[in-house]
């Protein structure tokens, strides 16, 4: 029974990053297609996991006003959170906004 529990926990840990990658990929594809509702959902799910790519995606949506009302304060907030985790795209966009 312990071995089964160990295998289950190990499988959950090993699939979590790939699930986050899937959310980001799905969000990016939706964004590029103009399906901003789906992109917003995918990026929101990622931000709840403190994922820098999701935070960057949210910043971009608020920066451009795609799928949400344009809001530079919100864009800066999301870019800042992402930039603090080392996301170079967020760092660049944040610098451009200042």
Stretches found by the model and what they are:
Residues 23-30, 57-64, 93-98:
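Hydrophobic face of amphipathic alpha-helices that form TPR/SEL1-like repeat modules
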Residues 1-4:
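Positively charged n-region of N-terminal signal peptides that target proteins for export
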Residues 16-20:
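Sec/Tat signal peptide C-region and signal peptidase I cleavage site
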Residues 7-15:
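Bacterial N-terminal signal peptides
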Residues 31-35, 48-51, 64-66, 71, ...:
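Short helix-capping/linker turns of helical repeat alpha-solenoids
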